[in-house]
Amino acid sequence: MNRIMTAPFSHYLEALRIQRWDDHRYYHHSRINQSLHLLSAMSFVVSYVFLFIDPALSALIAWGISMTSRQSGHFFFEPRGYDHVNRATHEHKEDIKIGYNLRRKVVLMALWAAAPAVLYFSPNFLGLLNEEVVRGGYLKSLGLIWFYIGIGGLIFRTVHLFFLRDVTTGLVWALKIMTDPFHDILLYWRSPLALLRGELIDPMDHAQSTH
């Protein structure tokens, strides 16, 4: 632990760079997925603005727009065949995924999708919401539930990585997740233009040059 705490800041920046690069080159080949990530990123930035003003509204934006567009890109548009750029199978990429791979995302998204139904039949969400929150209305309650699901998902996987990998990997991954919206805007702002040209798959020439 002492070694982790005394590691130079450049060590964490390099680990962050590697995680971001691997995430891009392995899991973001589809231009539609990239464009949806751009929409997601811009929506996340808006949700960040409301985070300390109205957490419920922030979560409604984050889950209702950002996560929906982001995950639909992964589930429906990202190729699942053999990755010739990285010379890796889909199964291998799923196994080495640091964050939430598709299997883990199914669990997280199931919790998200189940929350509105549970709240409809139990306005206090099985006793977890106090009366003041319930009086705020359905959307206010739903936003707070989604807020805690999001925070819980981030903390759970971060701590999980402490044991699966190491503390540095977990902390860097958490930082990556929180700053991804800003990075994705810089990375994918050209993707809609590529789509308009009819380019459905990023040729990933920049990734192939690293092999």
Please report, for each region that a protein language model flagged, where it lies by residue.
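Membrane interfacial helix-start motif at the N-side
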Residues: 17-48, 94-110
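Membrane-helix exit/interface motif
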Residues: 47-50, 72-81, 117-118
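Helix-coil boundary and interhelical linker segments in multi-pass alpha-helical membrane proteins
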Residues: 46-61, 118-144
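C-terminal halves and exits of single transmembrane alpha-helices
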Residues: 101-125, 186-193
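Hydrophobic alpha-helical membrane-embedded segments
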Residues: 53-78, 151-164
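An amphipathic alpha-helical core segment
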Residues: 139-156
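Alpha-helical transmembrane segments and their membrane-interface junctions
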Residues: 111-132, 197-210
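Membrane-proximal soluble regions of multi-pass membrane proteins
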Residues: 2-24, 75-99, 159-211
